Amino acid sequence: MSLRPEALKGAGSGTHVAGQVDYRLARNVVVSEFRKGRLSRLDVCDAHPELLRAAMNVGDETREDCPICEEAKVRIVSYVFGSRLPPSGVCVTSKAEMAKLARTAKDLTCYVVEVCPDCSWNHLARSFAISHRR
């Protein structure tokens, strides 16, 4: 699910998105360095097997080709970490699930990762904090 902070509008009273960090500039540098030959495919195609599994089974396919292999479409996977959640976080698969987490947990951080299931490219796309004021 390509989660954005706007998806939480109406998640319940007291839900507040504290800000967003976009990692596009860092991504562009990595892709540029790969294309210049300064980074190898092994350097940039290193997705953990669990991230690949999540991308294939619950990730949202985008219209964007993988910037490394240029053969597959990039998939988006969202993870949430915070109080009252498992240490490994929760892979969020719907806006409704995210809204429920936002209502019940005190403070959360959501990480949105782009993944290529073919070549294992992965990069953090954005992150944002969510707080629940009672």
Map each language-model feature to its residues.
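Short Cys/His-rich Zn2+-coordinating modules
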Residues: R41-M56, S94-A102
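Short, non-ligating residues that shape and space the ligands of small metal-coordination modules
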Residues: A72-I76, N122-F128
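Short cysteine/histidine-rich metal-coordination sites, predominantly Zn2+-binding motifs
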Residues: V80-C91, S131-R134
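Short, flexible, mixed-charge glycine/proline-rich loop motifs
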Residues: E50-R63, I76, T104-C110
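Short metal-binding segments enriched for Cys and/or His
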Residues: K95-C110, N122-R126
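N-terminal alpha-helical interaction blocks
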Residues: M1-P49
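Helix-rich interaction surfaces within compact, conserved domain-sized segments
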Residues: C110-C116
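Short cysteine-rich clusters marking metal-coordination/redox-active sites
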Residues: C66-C69, C116-C119
